[in-house]
């Protein structure tokens, strides 16, 4: 699994007091969101199109890489996208359950 249980939040920001020369401030943002899967899908589609044509493959195999390494990398990328999709689907289901609970709670009368 590519996801770890010990990360409680999905966003981290930091501001550096010592900025690069010529700038007043430096900041870093790291976000772990299922939205990244769209980028992975696009890269995977581009890779697959080039790999099917064996574009540039000779440069890598000539240096000792095996074609199977590319197939394995493609499979790993597809697995990663699938896992992000599962987390996205699970989150959407959880939100749906929360909305249902909220709607049920609104129908109750309190004395």
UniProtKB/Swiss-Prot annotation:
List GO terms (cellular component aspect).
cytoplasm; microtubule
Entries under Gene3D superfamilies matching the protein: Helix hairpin bin, Tubulin/FtsZ, C-terminal domain
Q: Which cofactor does it need?
A: Mg(2+)
Q: Reply yes or no: does the keyword ATP-binding apply.
A: no
- Cysteine pairs forming cystine bridges in this chain are none
Stretch list, region Disordered: 82-111
Location in the cell: Cytoplasm, Cytoskeleton
Listed A to Z, the keywords are:
Cytoplasm, Cytoskeleton, GTP-binding, Microtubule, Nucleotide-binding
The UniProt regions of compositional bias labelled Acidic residues, in chain numbering, are 91-111
Q: Which GO terms describe its biological process?
A: microtubule-based process
Q: Which family does it belong to?
A: Belongs to the tubulin family.
Protein task: Tubulin is the major constituent of microtubules, a cylinder consisting of laterally associated linear protofilaments composed of alpha- and beta-tubulin heterodimers. Microtubules grow by the addition of GTP-tubulin dimers to the microtubule end, where a stabilizing cap forms. Below the cap, tubulin dimers are in GDP-bound state, owing to GTPase activity of alpha-tubulin.
Protein name per the record: Tubulin beta chain
Lineage here is: Eukaryota, Metazoa, Spiralia, Lophotrochozoa, Mollusca
């Amino acid at each position: 699994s590519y996801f770890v249980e010990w990360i409680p939040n999905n966003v981290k920001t930091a501001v550096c007091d010592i900025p690069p020369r010529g700038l007043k401030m430096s900041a870093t943002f790291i976000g772990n969101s299922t939205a990244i899967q769209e980028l992975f899908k696009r890269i995977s589609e581009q890779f697959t199109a080039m790999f099917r044509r064996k574009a540039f493959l000779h440069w890598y195999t000539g240096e000792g890489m095996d074609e199977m390494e590319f197939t394995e990398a493609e499979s790993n990328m597809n697995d990663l996208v699938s896992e992000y999709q599962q987390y996205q689907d699970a989150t959407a289901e959880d939100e749906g359950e929360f909305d249902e609970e909220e709607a049920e709670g609104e129908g109750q009368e309190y004395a």
